[in-house]
């Protein structure tokens, strides 16, 4: 009998213990990351061949305390390696763990390697070679604080590598994880199993191999014991032959196919079919291209299990689509799979609540670095389902957080706002406006409509707010927005807005290059909803731009810190004599040019200038009748000579603007600094007068956010 250790993913240790016991292991003892057990040769080989949950099977050779690299080397060089393999074989050392002296795993692996080759030299043998790709012998060393365990890896390559997967779709499950998911589900052999989002088919293939009694490693060609001197070839051949005969018997029984795999992507289905063929279970699984929204029960009056690992996104941009996917999936489960069991594995537990199903059991697990959960459900019988569907029409929403009343309040507020603001916007001939702006403190976000698109901007939560609760609230909000607006998920865009530093408001978020135009008081303006934090149009300045258009008739107009030139468009459409548009960003200046062309505004009288606005202003010798200046609150761009602070520097700016302002000219000055205070005394010294018009420039959709900007009319004193 040998002392052995089976490694597995965290969370599966107890499940592995049951499997090992069923395979004949004795004295099983669970520890974190695996199970210790004893076994004779026959059981050892049977476990290697049949274990669906083990990552590796290790034979411990050395267990000792080490306090230095010399202790490590001495422990290795003192081991009788010739009893395990000779000098002609290649080997590789896997080293995991550190302590105060062995601080790097590469150093630990090197010292183990040195000890092994030096042992052979001391015994008059040649040094065995290291092979990092295909070693004959694999040595596994694990250091936990000061305790070292050195083992012979009998598996060779990790046991999750079954050999049947030639190609996969995105984010494939490891075979060992897939097997654990199947074993933890409520599926019973001989009953139907359906995977509606099967990807490369790993869940179904693992289950089908269980049904067909196919050993997961039946077709493995290379093992970690092939060149081990302790290998018992006779016993191994016996165990392997038993596995071959079991698989043949199952095949000859002509099992009825009752595994179904669906996926929207026909390309990944082809990979799944090939994988199933390699695994010897292609005759048991039926594959079909299909969307979850059209999912139908493929069986006839049979009761079975739905098993699935739906997509889950770490990036927030995928959230609207995922909420819709899980909601639709839950609906189809209730209408098509009454009295069935369902087992869902997900890395986003909050999304599972969108199924609107009550789990009777759940398990925690890891998928690589991700914390995941598997939940088991039972679908109510059909009469209960029909009643539930009748009572859950359009106004009933799927919410994630526990406080569903607050979530319903958000939905009601949004519905009320839409009724009021949509009517107003239609009268004003607008199709870009705000629907919601942190009206409820629990839902600190903005919702903007851009034609047939919706942008949700979540303001960054304070550090004292629990991240999970904030995430749940966001899921609730998106779910409500999808339901209340009826918008398609691919037209809902989600962004997280944080406090800006320097020029970070100009940083790119994506590179989709998707532009379309919106209408604003007769102007057409290009917007881009995905590539930048801002869209190219500041909605709160809509009335300011309208006012500039009305003031611009026959005047020379200057737009400083122009952004995408939307104010210039209004001035030009208002029959300005000339326009000059200045911005430091070449990207936004090109955008401004496209805005002008979109409105058929052309000619030498419309100038676009790429420059540092403050430096350009210092050198400008032209005179203007109407100047619009909307500077950033703060900027320390490397392309600017000095930093800029609107509170600190606005009087200096006004002094320069006065110089180029004609006698009867007007400056429209605006900024977004909350608490901004105009230096009236400083203006008087410059012989300028100022009148605040902030309230007049605040449109209906921003009337609750009175501090979003401040706006001033500044003229020469008469």
Swiss-Prot record:
Which Gene Ontology terms of cellular component type are present? cytoplasm
The compartments listed are: Cytoplasm
Keywords for this entry? Cytoplasm, Methyltransferase, RNA-binding, rRNA processing, S-adenosyl-L-methionine, Transferase
A molecular function annotated in GO for this UniProt entry is:
RNA binding
Question: Which InterPro entries does this entry report, sorted A to Z?
Answer: 23SrRNA_methyltr_KL, DNA_methylase_N6_adenine_CS, RlmKL-like_Mtase, RlmKL-like_Mtase_CS, RlmL_1st, SAM-dep_methyl-trfase, SAM-dependent_MTases_sf, THUMP_dom
Q: Which residues form the THUMP domain?
A: 43-154
- Kindly give the CDD domains that the UniProt entry links to this protein: AdoMet_MTases, THUMP_AdoMetMT
Q: Which domain of life is it from?
A: Bacteria
Q: Does the keyword RNA-binding apply?
A: yes
- List the PANTHER family hit by this protein, alphabetically: RIBOSOMAL RNA LARGE SUBUNIT METHYLTRANSFERASE K/L, RIBOSOMAL RNA LARGE SUBUNIT METHYLTRANSFERASE K_L
Record-stated family: Belongs to the methyltransferase superfamily. RlmKL family.
Q: Can you say what this protein is called? A: Ribosomal RNA large subunit methyltransferase K/L
Organism, scientific name: Histophilus somni (strain 2336)
Q: Which gene encodes it?
A: rlmL
């Amino acid at each position: 009998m040998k002392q052995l250790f089976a490694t597995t993913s965290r969370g599966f240790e107890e499940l592995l213990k049951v499997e090992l016991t069923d395979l004949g292991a004795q004295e099983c003892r669970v520890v974190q990351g695996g199970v210790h057990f004893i076994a004779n040769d026959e059981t050892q080989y049977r476990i290697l061949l049949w274990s669906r949950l083990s990552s590796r099977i290790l034979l411990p050779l050395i267990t000792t305390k080490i306090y230095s690299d010399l202790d490590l080397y001495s422990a290795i060089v003192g081991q009788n390696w010739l009893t395990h393999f000779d000098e002609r074989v290649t080997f590789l050392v896997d080293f995991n763990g550190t302590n105060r002296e062995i601080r790097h795993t590469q150093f630990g692996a090197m010292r183990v390697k040195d000890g092994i080759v030096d042992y052979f030299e001391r015994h008059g043998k040649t040094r065995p070679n290291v092979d990092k790709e295909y070693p004959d012998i694999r040595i596994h060393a694990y250091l936990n604080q000061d305790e070292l365990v050195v083992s012979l890896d009998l598996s060779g390559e990790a046991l999750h590598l079954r050999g049947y997967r030639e190609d996969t779709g995105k984010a494939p499950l490891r075979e060992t994880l897939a097997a654990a998911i199947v074993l933890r589900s409520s599926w019973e052999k001989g009953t139907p199993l359906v995977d509606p989002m099967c990807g490369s088919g790993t869940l179904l293939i693992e289950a089908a191999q269980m049904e067909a009694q196919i050993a997961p490693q039946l077709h493995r060609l290379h093992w970690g014991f092939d060149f081990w001197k302790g290998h018992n070839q006779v016993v191994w051949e016996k165990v392997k032959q038993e596995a071959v005969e079991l698989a043949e018997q199952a095949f000859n029984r002509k099992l009825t196919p009752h595994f179904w795999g669906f996926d929207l992507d026909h390309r990944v289905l082809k990979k799944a079919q090939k994988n199933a063929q390699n695994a010897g279970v292609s005759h048991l699984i039926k594959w079909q291209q299909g969307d979850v929204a059209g999912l139908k029960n493929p069986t006839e009056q049979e009761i079975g299990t739905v098993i699935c690992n739906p997509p889950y996104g770490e990036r927030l941009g995928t959230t609207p689509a995922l909420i819709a996917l899980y909601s639709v999936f839950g609906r189809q489960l209730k209408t098509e799979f009454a009295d069935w069991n369902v087992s869902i594995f997900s890395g986003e537990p909050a999304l599972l609540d969108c199924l609107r199903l009550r789990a009777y059991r759940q398990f925690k697990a890891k998928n690589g670095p991700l914390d995941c959960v598997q939940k088991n459900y039972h679908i109510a019988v059909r009469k209960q389902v029909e009643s539930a569907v009748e009572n859950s029409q359009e106004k009933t929403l799927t919410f994630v957080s526990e406080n569903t009343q607050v979530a319903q309040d958000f939905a009601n507020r949004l519905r009320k706002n839409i009724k009021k603001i949509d009517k107003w916007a239609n009268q004003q001939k607008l199709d870009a406006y705000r629907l919601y702006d942190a009206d409820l403190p629990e839902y600190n976000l903005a919702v903007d409509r851009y034609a047939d698109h919706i942008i949700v901007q979540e303001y960054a939560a304070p550090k004292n707010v629990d991240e999970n609760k904030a995430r749940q609230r966001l899921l609730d909000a998106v779910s409500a927005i999808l339901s209340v607006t009826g918008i398609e998920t691919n037209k809902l865009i989600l962004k997280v807005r944080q406090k800006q530093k320097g020029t970070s408001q100009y940083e790119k978020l994506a590179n989709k290059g998707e532009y379309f135009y919106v209408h604003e008081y007769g102007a057409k303006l290009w917007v881009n909803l995905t590539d930048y934090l801002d869209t190219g149009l500041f909605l709160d300045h809509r009335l300011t731009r309208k006012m500039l258009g009305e003031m611009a008739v026959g005047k020379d107009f200057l737009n400083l810190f122009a952004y995408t030139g939307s104010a210039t468009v209004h001035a030009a459409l208002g029959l300005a004599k000339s326009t000059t548009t200045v911005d430091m960003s070449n990207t936004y200046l090109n955008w401004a040019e496209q805005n002008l062309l979109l409105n058929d505004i052309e000619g030498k009288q419309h100038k676009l200038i790429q420059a540092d606005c403050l430096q350009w202003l210092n050198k400008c010798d032209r005179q203007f009748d109407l100047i619009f200046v909307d500077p950033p609150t703060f900027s320390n761009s490397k392309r600017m000579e000095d930093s800029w602070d609107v509170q600190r520097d606005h009087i200096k700016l006004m002094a320069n603007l006065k110089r180029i302002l004609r006698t009867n000219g007007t400056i429209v000055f605006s900024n977004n600094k909350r608490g901004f205070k105009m230096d009236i005394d400083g203006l008087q010294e410059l012989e300028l007068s100022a009148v605040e018009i902030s309230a007049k420039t605040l449109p209906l959709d921003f009337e609750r956010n009175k501090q979003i900007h401040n706006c001033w009319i500044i003229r020469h004193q008469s």
